[in-house]
Regions:
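Enzymes that bind and transform nitrogen-containing heteroaromatic metabolites
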Residues: 1-178
Length: 178
């Protein structure tokens, strides 16, 4: 069985990016001495599944930051060739979250990092998320792209842990209840 796991930062008012996708408010708080648990989180993940918006944002970084395979779920990118530098690292697919996980299960994948606001919402709506690590950044944006959208029903969570960092960020780890 493939399990999916979320690791994401949000503003105090619940946004993951400005309306135009800008994450300057997050990047300016980047402290290379604090990894906020990311290394431990990603260590046991076999694959990363992200949405188009996250993929396009990561393409603007100086270097490709991932050392494991990435599946980009997007109807718009399905027929787009993978950039030469990312061949063997990235695949595009228009499959649904459930179908994508079934495909990965056939490849003997066990644990997957889910990244990207809309994609996280899709996985949540389908009941496919095992746990969420949310790092809250002490800034109010007032508007932007929310982490959570409309859900068909309440999703109960159990707090597994919570900690704060010297930079003022607060991280909470939740397990989703069945």
């Amino acid at each position: 069985m493939v399990t999916t796991h979320v690791f994401i930062a949000v503003s105090l008012d619940g946004y993951i990016a400005r309306q135009d996708g800008d994450i300057d408010w997050l990047l300016k708080r980047d402290d290379p001495t604090e990894d906020h648990g990311y290394a431990a989180f990603i260590a046991d993940k076999d694959w990363i599944i992200m949405g188009r918006g996250s993929y396009e944002k990561v393409l603007t970084f100086d270097e490709w930051p991932y050392d494991r395979p990435v599946l980009v779920l997007s109807r718009q990118l399905t027929d787009t060739p993978v950039p030469e530098a990312l061949k063997g690292k990235v695949q595009f697919s228009c499959r649904t979250p459930r179908e994508a996980l079934a495909d990965l299960m056939e490849k003997n994948v066990h644990r997957v990092y889910i990244d990207g606001g809309q994609l996280i919402q899709s996985f949540l709506r389908e009941g496919l998320v095992a746990d969420i690590v949310i790092t809250t950044v002490p800034v109010l944006l007032g508007s932007g792209k929310p982490l959570f959208g409309v859900l068909p029903h309440d999703i109960d969570l159990t707090l597994l842990s919570s900690c704060s960092f010297p930079s003022g960020l607060v991280q909470s780890h939740y397990r989703l209840m069945s």
